[in-house]
């Protein structure tokens, strides 16, 4: 039986860990150097609930310079990974300010998984000191859960691409969301207006 094909698009602020998450999941290696993304695509095979799924992973650039290009990634999307970084409260703030309106405009009815990246930095002393200088602290798990409820996400997960903690679970949940969206008969898929 042929694998079911699904398209996943990952969005979120620049440098919040999107590309690392995709690379660790698809290639099982952590890139040590930061390279801002233009557009990269990967394909990964995943099995969930005894179903073989071929997941097309569409990376996007979070930087504002790409705001007009990014929508080209959205058509026919089955699931969105909307990311923020646990060491950047500002990136969480941009979830309702920027990312949710953009995604809901181009991808109405497509399930969203909210993902807190860089979980390993929550208790990192250097990170905490740097944030304290700006009167901030790392994002708490309940803040992520509250945001997921607020934007009506399919689910909320935290992970660390660096330690691989929670990475597989993110893509399992995303695959389940993509499969369920089809089952419910919703007209999912993104529109380019």
Curated annotation (Swiss-Prot):
<feature type="glycosylation site" description="(Microbial infection) O-linked (GlcNAc) tyrosine; by Yersinia Afp18">
    <location>
        <position position="34"/>
    </location>
</feature>
<keyword id="KW-0547">Nucleotide-binding</keyword>
<dbReference type="GO" id="GO:0044319">
    <property type="term" value="P:wound healing, spreading of cells"/>
</dbReference>
<dbReference type="GO" id="GO:0019901">
    <property type="term" value="F:protein kinase binding"/>
</dbReference>
<dbReference type="InterPro" id="IPR003578">
    <property type="entry name" value="Small_GTPase_Rho"/>
</dbReference>
<comment type="similarity">
    <text>Belongs to the small GTPase superfamily. Rho family.</text>
</comment>
<dbReference type="GO" id="GO:0032154">
    <property type="term" value="C:cleavage furrow"/>
</dbReference>
<dbReference type="GO" id="GO:0003924">
    <property type="term" value="F:GTPase activity"/>
</dbReference>
<keyword id="KW-0342">GTP-binding</keyword>
<feature type="binding site">
    <location>
        <begin position="117"/>
        <end position="120"/>
    </location>
    <ligand>
        <name>GTP</name>
    </ligand>
</feature>
<comment type="function">
    <text>Regulates a signal transduction pathway linking plasma membrane receptors to the assembly of focal adhesions and actin stress fibers.</text>
</comment>
<feature type="binding site">
    <location>
        <begin position="12"/>
        <end position="19"/>
    </location>
    <ligand>
        <name>GTP</name>
    </ligand>
</feature>
<protein>
    <recommendedName>
        <fullName>Rho-related GTP-binding protein RhoA-C</fullName>
    </recommendedName>
</protein>
<dbReference type="Pfam" id="PF00071">
    <property type="entry name" value="Ras"/>
</dbReference>
<dbReference type="InterPro" id="IPR001806">
    <property type="entry name" value="Small_GTPase"/>
</dbReference>
<dbReference type="GO" id="GO:0043149">
    <property type="term" value="P:stress fiber assembly"/>
</dbReference>
<dbReference type="GO" id="GO:0005829">
    <property type="term" value="C:cytosol"/>
</dbReference>
<keyword id="KW-0472">Membrane</keyword>
<dbReference type="GO" id="GO:0007266">
    <property type="term" value="P:Rho protein signal transduction"/>
</dbReference>
<feature type="modified residue" description="Cysteine methyl ester">
    <location>
        <position position="190"/>
    </location>
</feature>
<keyword id="KW-1003">Cell membrane</keyword>
<feature type="lipid moiety-binding region" description="S-geranylgeranyl cysteine">
    <location>
        <position position="190"/>
    </location>
</feature>
<keyword id="KW-0449">Lipoprotein</keyword>
<feature type="binding site">
    <location>
        <begin position="59"/>
        <end position="63"/>
    </location>
    <ligand>
        <name>GTP</name>
    </ligand>
</feature>
<keyword id="KW-0488">Methylation</keyword>
<feature type="binding site">
    <location>
        <begin position="160"/>
        <end position="162"/>
    </location>
    <ligand>
        <name>GTP</name>
    </ligand>
</feature>
<dbReference type="GO" id="GO:0032956">
    <property type="term" value="P:regulation of actin cytoskeleton organization"/>
</dbReference>
<feature type="binding site">
    <location>
        <begin position="30"/>
        <end position="37"/>
    </location>
    <ligand>
        <name>GTP</name>
    </ligand>
</feature>
<keyword id="KW-0325">Glycoprotein</keyword>
<keyword id="KW-0636">Prenylation</keyword>
<dbReference type="GO" id="GO:0043197">
    <property type="term" value="C:dendritic spine"/>
</dbReference>
<dbReference type="GO" id="GO:0005886">
    <property type="term" value="C:plasma membrane"/>
</dbReference>
<dbReference type="InterPro" id="IPR027417">
    <property type="entry name" value="P-loop_NTPase"/>
</dbReference>
<dbReference type="GO" id="GO:1902766">
    <property type="term" value="P:skeletal muscle satellite cell migration"/>
</dbReference>
<feature type="propeptide" description="Removed in mature form">
    <location>
        <begin position="191"/>
        <end position="193"/>
    </location>
</feature>
<dbReference type="GO" id="GO:0016477">
    <property type="term" value="P:cell migration"/>
</dbReference>
<dbReference type="InterPro" id="IPR005225">
    <property type="entry name" value="Small_GTP-bd"/>
</dbReference>
<dbReference type="GO" id="GO:0005525">
    <property type="term" value="F:GTP binding"/>
</dbReference>
């Amino acid at each position: 039986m042929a694998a079911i094909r699904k398209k996943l698009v990952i969005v979120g602020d620049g440098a919040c860990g999107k590309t690392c998450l995709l690379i660790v999941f698809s290639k099982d290696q952590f890139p040590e150097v930061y390279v801002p993304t233009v557009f990269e695509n990967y394909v990964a095979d995943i099995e969930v609930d005894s179903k073989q799924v071929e997941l097309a992973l569409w990376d996007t650039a979070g930087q504002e310079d790409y705001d007009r290009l990014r929508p080209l990634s959205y058509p026919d999307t089955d699931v969105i990974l909307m990311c923020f970084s646990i060491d950047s409260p500002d990136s969480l703030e941009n979830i309702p300010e920027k990312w949710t309106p953009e995604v809901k405009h181009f991808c109405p009815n497509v399930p969203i998984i909210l993902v807190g990246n860089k979980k390993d930095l929550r208790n990192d002393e250097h990170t905490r000191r740097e944030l304290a200088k700006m009167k901030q602290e790392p994002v708490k798990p309940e803040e992520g859960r509250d945001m997921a409820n607020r934007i009506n996400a399919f689910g909320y997960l935290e992970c660390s691409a660096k330690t691989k903690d929670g990475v597989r679970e993110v893509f399992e949940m995303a695959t389940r969301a993509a499969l369920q969206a089809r089952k419910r008969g919703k007209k999912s898929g993104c529109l380019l207006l």
